[in-house]
Amino acid sequence: MSAMTPREIVSELNRFIIGQDGAKRAVAIALRNRWRRMQLDEELRHEVTPKNILMIGPTGVGKTEIARRLAKLANAPFIKVEATKFTEVGYVGKEVDSIIRDLTDSAIKMVRSQAIDRNRNRAEEMAEERILDVLIPPAKNNWGQNETPAEPSSARQSFRKKLREGQLDDKEIEIDLAAISGGVEIMAPPGMEEMTSQLQSMFQNIGGQKQKPRKLKIKEAMKLLVEEEAAKLVNQEELKQEAIDAVEQHGIVFIDEIDKVCKRGESSGPDVSREGVQRDLLPLVEGCTVSTKHGMVKTDHILFIASGAFQVASPSDLIPELQGRLPIRVELQALTTNDFERILTEPSASITVQYKALMNTEGVNITFTPDGISKIAAAAWQVNETAENIGARRLHTVLERLMEEISYDASDLNGQSITIDAEYVSKHLDELVADEDLSRFIL
C-alpha cells in the first residue's frame, strides 16, 4: 500500500490531469485514509470503514483519467468497471459479484509479481547453475547419478565468468523447460465465466507439470529459467492468502457510468440493467462475503469510487440506499479554453509532446507556438459549444485533423522543421469550425 501523503498524491496527479482540484483532494484523502487505518490497533481498525466517493461531472473532464492514474499510485488491488456491463441476478449477463472476483484475480497477479521479484536473486543463481549444467555436464557416479564436486571446476568457473559478462548470450543450447499447457478453450455463456474458468483450471492441472526440451539462445533461456525458478520458490497457498488480505484491506473498485443505471422517471415493467443492478451493488458496498476460486473475500473495507456524467439523470435518481453509501460527493467542472491550453502544454506526456515525438521518428521537427496552442484550444472549445460537449477528448479530434497533412507527407519531409502557429491553425481549421454542419460531422 502506498504511504504517500495527500499533498504528494495531488502533486503526482497534477502531472497528468489539469484542474479538478476537488476530485484530486477527495481521492488523495481516501487513499491516505487507507494507510492511516492500517496504523490503528486491530480492534479499532475493524470498525473504521472507508468513505466511498461519488464523482459527478460532464464527459471528458478527467473522471476516468483520475481513476487510471490512481491505480498506478495506489500500489494496491484496483479494478475499473463499467456499471452498464452488469445485469440483475437471474438475468443473462454478468453479475456484480464478478467485480470482486476480477479484483481478486488482479491481486493474485500483483502479489505473484512481487513475490517473484523478491526471489529473483536466488532464481538467477539457480538458472545460472542449470545453464552451466548444460554447457559442462556434471560427472556421473557408478549409479548414473550426478556427482556434486566439493569445489567447482576451473572450466565451470571460466564459463560462469563468460556467462555473467554476456559473452555466451548468442550461443544456442537445448534445455528442458516447463511445457506451457495450451489448456482447453471453453466458450463461456454470459454470466457463467466463473464456472468455465474453474473447469479450465481443472483441465490444466490434469497430467501435472511436464518438461519439454527447447532450443534457445542463452540470453533468452536465462530469462525463461529465471521466471520458472522464481515461480517454484513461491508458495501458492501463502500467495492466495496474501492476495485475499490485500483485497480485503486495500482493494479499490472504480465504477464508471453509474448514472446509466439510474431509473429515469416513472416506468413500468422489468428494468433489468438499472435498479436491479443498483440493488445488487448494495451488499458489495455495504459489506458482504463473496465466493471466489481463491477463497472467500469480505468486502467490508474495500473502497468504492463511483462516477457518472449525470446529464440526463441526477444523483438523486440513484436508489436512496446506494446514495447513503456514497457519502462523499465531488463535482468536476466543465473545461474552459484556458484548461484546454494547459492540457496541451503542462502534462509530462501531453498530446503535443506525443505528436512531436511521433513526427521526430520520421526526421520532422514540429514546433507549437503559444499563439498556435491558444488557437487550437479556442477551436476545440468552440466546437464543444456548438456541437456535443465531449470535453478534453475534442482536442484529439481537432489535433488529428490539424496534423493529418503533415502525418501523411512526413516520410517526404525528412530533415524539415514545421512551425504550427495561429496562422497555420486558421488555415487548416477555421473553415471547419465556422461551418456548424461540417464541424458536427468532422470535428
From Swiss-Prot:
Q: How does it assemble?
A: A double ring-shaped homohexamer of HslV is capped on each side by a ring-shaped HslU homohexamer. The assembly of the HslU/HslV complex is dependent on binding of ATP.
Record function comment: ATPase subunit of a proteasome-like degradation complex; this subunit has chaperone activity. The binding of ATP and its subsequent hydrolysis by HslU are essential for unfolding of protein substrates subsequently hydrolyzed by HslV. HslU recognizes the N-terminal part of its protein substrates and unfolds these before they are guided to HslV for hydrolysis.
The superkingdom listed in its UniProt entry is: Bacteria
| Cross-referenced InterPro entries | AAA+_ATPase (IPR003593), ATP-dep_Clp_protease_ClpX (IPR050052), ATPase_AAA_core (IPR003959), Clp_ATPase_C (IPR019489), HslU (IPR004491), P-loop_NTPase (IPR027417)
Q: Which GO terms describe its biological process?
A: protein unfolding; proteolysis involved in protein catabolic process
- Native organism is Erwinia tasmaniensis (strain DSM 17950 / CFBP 7177 / CIP 109463 / NCPPB 4357 / Et1/99)
Name used for this protein in its record: ATP-dependent protease ATPase subunit HslU
Q: What is the lineage of its organism?
A: Bacteria, Pseudomonadati, Pseudomonadota, Gammaproteobacteria, Enterobacterales
Family label: Belongs to the ClpX chaperone family. HslU subfamily.
